Amino acid sequence: MEPTFNKMTAAGYHAIEQEIEDLKQQRPERIRILAAAAALGDRSENAEYSSAKRDLGRLESRLRYLNKQLQYAQIVQPADNDQLDIGKFVTIEFLDDHDQITYQLVGKQEANLEQQKISFTSPIGQALANHTVDDVVTVNAPNGAYQVKVIAVKRA
């Protein structure tokens, strides 16, 4: 079976690398806390030991997950054209209320609505992919379809 690659921007890849480094720096302290809790004696009723073991397990699990993300990462460089793809910024106008908003189309690991980053696999991301300025696009969202107009497309 072919592995599925995770498309992402270079910035998203570097953010994962940074999180891995941060977690690796936290690991020795978590191990020290676990060892200190284990030294307190009976582990069957040692809440500090159980908590420290759980914390270290979460850290190790997150590291494995992030390393897999990098292992199967495919960094996408935005094409030098007017079509919307990963890494580019798009300004859209919602045709029902004429509100405008600018998003960056990113890989699914990078999506963050608070930062106006939408995944290329989201309903709106899929609908906008490969469209250009002045295109009217129908977005098939879980709560119903709506239309948006592409106002601008810019490279990052």
UniProtKB/Swiss-Prot annotation:
Residues 43-74 form a coiled coil. One of its GO terms (biological process) is regulation of DNA-templated transcription elongation. InterPro entries: GreA/GreB_C_sf (IPR036953), TF_GreA/GreB_CS (IPR018151), Tscrpt_elong_fac_GreA (IPR006359), Tscrpt_elong_fac_GreA/B (IPR028624), Tscrpt_elong_fac_GreA/B_C (IPR001437), Tscrpt_elong_fac_GreA/B_fam (IPR023459), Tscrpt_elong_fac_GreA/B_N (IPR022691), Tscrpt_elong_fac_GreA/B_N_sf (IPR036805). It comes from the Bacteria. GO terms for molecular function: DNA binding; RNA polymerase binding. Keywords: Coiled coil, DNA-binding, Transcription, Transcription regulation. Gene3D superfamilies: Transcription elongation factor, GreA/GreB, C-terminal domain, Transcription elongation factor, GreA/GreB, N-terminal domain. Pfam families: GreA_GreB, GreA_GreB_N. NCBIfam families: greA, PRK00226.1-4. Necessary for efficient RNA polymerase transcription elongation past template-encoded arresting sites. The arresting sites in DNA have the property of trapping a certain fraction of elongating RNA polymerases that pass through, resulting in locked ternary complexes. Cleavage of the nascent transcript by cleavage factors such as GreA or GreB allows the resumption of elongation from the new 3'terminus. GreA releases sequences of 2 to 3 nucleotides. Belongs to the GreA/GreB family. This is Transcription elongation factor GreA 1. It comes from Lactiplantibacillus plantarum (strain ATCC BAA-793 / NCIMB 8826 / WCFS1) (Lactobacillus plantarum).
